[in-house]
Amino acid sequence: MNCLKQLIEIKKSSLVILNDNNYVISHMKPTNVKVLQVWHACGAVKKFGNQIKRQYPVRNYDYVLCNAEYWKEPYSQAFGVNTNQVLVTGMPRIDTLLNRNERDEFFLKYPELKDKKLCLYAPTFRGNIIDGFKIQSFDFTKVKDYVVLYKFHPLLGDIQCNGGVNMNKEDLYTLMQVSDCLISDYSSVIFDYSLLNKPMISYIPDVKEYKHNIGLNIDFDDFPGPVCTDEDQLVKALEFKDYDYDKLSYFQIKYMVYTDGKNTSRVIDTINQIMEEV
């Protein structure tokens, strides 16, 4: 019934804007309707969409937005489009990240965290709806110099972990702003966080298995921070000795071109151009 309702609304439209894949669009899109995929992430560390085995092929998109030229090829594969249909506009959400500041509000809510060194742990989810979701965690009590704030993917639910502070109900961008560093893995949050010019660590103990089973769209040699495969490496890496900010700048330029606060304007201009064509 939900598919039928969607189809009725789609048929009434000239343009459909998506931020996730859509079964109805991939199977029943009317020929006179244009589809713009803005996606819900700023990039894709792991392969996704048509790059991996899935229940149905992603198709019928007319345009896809991305953050840099680098993403044209992986996005064309994932969304079943030609590279010339992938448009480099930047994501509106980046304007939000760079232009707002909610530190004061956060520390009013959590006064016990003020003046503490805060490390945000924000991993991706593993698994799927059929087989169940999993999480790659570590012993937060081993981290001595930071308070670990953890926020997991919404699909994982409100999981509790000992030794850290549960931030699953807080806004991710607020947590990025208040934290001093990030630990993540195959999550696209590394692209957003890189623009804040703060240190990052990649904790990927299962990288060989992950490359084999899922596949990656980026080379972790590009990652600007320590890449750790066990907990001891991770704890040591949190000392952040000689962090390579030049490499961080290269990472930003390669994967996240626009930081001028005008991504939203470019996306609106793109939508207006599409509407003139329909």
Model-derived features with residue positions:
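Helix N-cap/beta->alpha junction signal
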Residues: 20-21, 67-70, 154, 186, ...
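Conserved catalytic-core segment of nucleotide-activated headgroup transferases in glycan assembly
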Residues: 86, 92-161, 228, 259-265
